[in-house]
Design a protein with these regions (language model features):
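A structural signal for multi-pass alpha-helical bundles of membrane permease subunits
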Residues: 4, 8-300
Length: 300
């Protein structure tokens, strides 16, 4: 094959592929890579939207760690929110998946109904609906009154507000549930048959067979839900605006306020990179510890 033939072949096929990929590549460079790198530069600058960035070194980070108590509170709230929602969502998703892993009449409709909340994700509409339901004169307190039970300040009590936000997140377990359900379908039936012959109980089969077989999916859901929880913003912003008394003031809220209320874009960029580093560190820890409990193939 001559050099000319190679060039002709490359031009016809590979350039066509590049042409199809070009919109995605351009979009990634403009909408993702450029903001990602520019935020890193701005995090070392004193930069307001209407002004010109001026390099200040590590001053934004020093201020965050040594002089900004609000930052430490928001970090604490974010980690607490993550510790509540991630295990809660995974346990709920797995429990429902086990319940739905059966062949009965209408099971597809039931699975769809359980999945519907996740279609809306962390949308503003869902957050507004949740706020209306849990306000002092909302639907939930009306039900409690009907049952002659005391009303609860779901959104007004600093000790309760974060739990209410967490309940909304756990309620949207559908995406994890679908993945768990697919994993359960792939567990070999002969393992259960052998265990049943040996006289193993349902509980023992679940923890000795089911859980080890689906640990890769548990790990995947754990990573994805942890990242999502650490980036939470919509529910805290729409439902409580970070209150009461900063009880739901997550890092996403802190970033938003600094950047778009106080227009301190350099400071907000530093916060965004702290969020990125926290996510990266927690993810690395999860990957490092996975070798002790995640089983692939015949390892289980």
């Amino acid at each position: 094959m001559t050099k000319q033939t190679k060039i002709k072949h490359y031009t016809k096929r590979d350039y066509a592929a590049f042409a199809y990929l070009a919109p995605w590549i351009i979009g990634m460079l403009v909408l993702q890579l450029y903001p990602f790198l520019s935020s890193l530069v701005y995090s070392f600058c004193n930069y307001k939207i209407t002004g010109t960035p001026s390099f200040t070194g590590l001053s934004n980070y020093i201020q965050l760690f040594t002089m900004d108590n609000e930052f430490w509170n928001s970090l604490k709230v974010t980690l607490t929110y993550t510790l509540y929602t991630v295990p809660g969502k995974l346990v709920m998703a797995l429990a429902v998946a086990v319940f739905l892993n059966r062949d009965i009449k209408g099971i597809n409709l039931i699975r769809t109904l359980y999945y519907i909340p996740s279609l809306f994700g962390g949308s503003v509409a869902v957050a507004l609906l949740w706020k209306i339901m849990f306000m002092d004169n909302g639907v939930i307190n009306a039900i409690l009154t009907t049952l002659h039970l005391p009303n609860v300040q779901w959104l007004g009590d600093p000790n309760q507000a974060l739990r209410t936000i967490c309940m909304m997140e756990i309620w949207q377990f559908g995406s994890s549930m679908v993945m768990f359900l697919a994993a359960l379908k792939n567990v070999p039936a002969d393992l259960y048959e052998a265990a049943e012959i040996d006289g193993a109980s349902k509980v023992k089969m679940f923890f000795s067979i089911t859980v080890p077989q689906i640990t890769p999916i548990i790990f995947f859901n754990l990573i994805m839900q942890t990242i999502q929880a650490l980036q939470n913003f919509t529910s805290a912003f729409v439902i409580t605006d970070g209150g009461p008394m900063k009880a739901t003031y997550v890092l996403g809220m802190k970033l938003y306020k600094e950047g778009f209320s106080y227009f301190k874009m350099g400071y907000a960029s530093a916060i965004s990179w702290i969020i990125f580093i926290v996510i990266m560190l927690i993810t690395l820890v999860l990957f490092a510890t996975s070798k002790w409990w995640v089983f692939y193939g015949d390892e289980s």
